[in-house]
Amino acid sequence: MIQKPIVQAIEQTLAAHLRSRTEWDEPPVVFTIQQSGPDSVVLVHIPVPRVVWDAHGHPPTVVANLAATVHQLPRHPDGTHLLVHQRAGKLLGVGFRYEAYTLAASSDAPAVQEAVRRRKAGGSVPRFREIVGRREERCITAVDLDGGRYMVTATRIEQAKSEATEPRTKYLAFSDPKRDTLTGNVVDATIRLLNAIKPLPIRDDPGGHR
């Protein structure tokens, strides 16, 4: 079971990573979350060529396809996946960083207000990026081996500048009744990737060899 100090370390490390970004229009990134010390974690980048992200255009599908591919790769004798750097520490989870557009219900922009109203009524709306007044965000969605879910976001303050707000973090444990409020294709793809690379138990063969 992942203890509270490690959960807090994951939150802090994800927020620090998002805070370190200074440019926009970056390609998405996926990484493992590994325990580097008693109360510390490290993020280890899983390389995905930019051409892969650009060719598909829908990052969650790229992550889901990556999960399906790496699931078939061989493993180390101890059951750990080849993508997990053993020297970085025990695997705790997986994270997925990306950029997205969102609509703020408190926005004064007429186009945003209309889009929010139509969404609440169950109607269709244009793509968020096409709506005048929408907000641009850097995001990290992460999941851990205990079923916990993490969401970290930072909003661009002005379109003409690169500064963003201080990252906001949200953690929902597996037992949290509000856990289902953090769902969607991004969460599903991240879970698939974690399931594809998480450690597998070592099986004894009939001859007594591992």
What is the role of each PLM region?
Residues 14-18, 79-81, 124-127:
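Short alpha-helical segments and helix-capping/turn motifs at coil-helix boundaries
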Residues 27-30, 93, 136-139:
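Short, surface-exposed beta-edge/turn micro-motifs
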Residues 107-210:
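Glycine-rich, aromatic-bearing surface loops/beta-hairpins
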Residues 16-65:
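N-terminal interaction modules that seed assembly of large macromolecular complexes
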Residues 1-24:
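Short N-terminal edge-element motif at the start of the domain
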Residues 39-42, 104-105, 149-150:
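Eukaryotic short linear interaction motifs
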Residues 1-9, 61, 177, 181, ...:
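Alpha-helix boundary/N-cap detector
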Residues 58-114:
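Short HxH-centered metal-ligating active-site micro-motif
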